[in-house]
A protein has these predicted regions:
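Ser/Thr/Gly/Pro-rich low-complexity, disordered linker/stalk segments of secreted
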Residues: 214-240
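Extended alpha-helical scaffold regions
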Residues: 203-207, 211
Length: 240
């Protein structure tokens, strides 16, 4: 998610006045100013699933998976995953799940959320746990370098908040990067490709898929193992 440093926000449309030597112009010349983006943390939300425990679901819990595209681990102390309903009102509040530990280099990190009444497959051992009950079809999840609840309720305000390191809106979410991702439901998540592509457009960066939760140890499966079909007992042949 591309960021503008706080000290430079709101200055992109202005210009800097640069004094040139008197021998050249003897006056001030206005030059365009290009805002520099904040360096990427290389951590993104790699998958969101809010259908845990719903009708038809295999997994019992909602979850958020994080991915680290960097070549070094990322310490998540003081970070959080936060959730906002897809169509927030003036009184809507972000719900917070604090994070601990680190995402391995090139690895994943699993955040378990609320448990539903259905499903028969537990998630892999989570790296962090919360109690947020997410919608299966529409909502916004943010990866935040803070444990203080966000206050932004629009895409523009959230984009201007320097603590927001990545943000995924899905379904009909008002708060999103670009357009919201589609394809989420009781039996499907929205997820990034294996390269963790992030172009700041949720609609193209994440697609509907079979839920595939993985923790920092790499444990997990995208397709819960089906119950094996019993082998039929052979019918004895009569003795001649």
């Amino acid at each position: 998610m591309t960021r503008i440093p706080p000290a430079l926000r709101g200055r992109g449309a202005k210009a800097l006045l640069v004094a040139l030597p008197v021998g050249l112009t003897g006056s001030l010349v206005a030059l365009p100013f290009t805002a520099q983006a904040e360096p990427s943390s290389d951590a993104v939300i790699s998958e969101v699933y809010g259908g845990g425990g719903n009708s038809g679901a295999s997994y019992t819990n909602d979850f958020v998976e994080l991915g680290n595209a960097a070549t070094a681990p990322l310490d998540l102390g003081g970070w959080s995953v936060q959730y906002l309903p897809g169509s927030p009102t003036a009184t809507s509040k972000w719900q917070v799940t604090p994070l601990t530990g680190a995402i391995p280099a090139g690895g994943t990190y699993l955040v378990q959320e609320a448990k539903g009444s259905g499903g028969d497959t537990a998630l892999p051992t989570p790296d962090a746990s919360g109690t947020i009950s997410m919608s299966a079809t529409t909502g916004t999840v943010a990866l935040v370098h803070s444990t203080t609840p966000l206050t932004c309720l629009t895409a523009a305000d959230c984009a201007a908040d320097g603590t927001v390191k990545d943000l995924v809106g899905f379904g009909t979410a008002v708060v999103r990067e670009g357009s919201p991702a589609t394809g989420a439901g009781n039996t499907t998540s929205v997820s990034r490709d294996t390269k963790l592509t992030d172009t700041d457009n949720n609609a193209t960066d994440l697609t509907g898929s079979v839920p595939s939760p993985h923790n920092t140890a790499g444990g997990g499966s995208g397709d819960p193992s089906p119950t094996p079909t019993p082998t039929p007992t052979p019918t004895p042949r009569p003795t001649p």
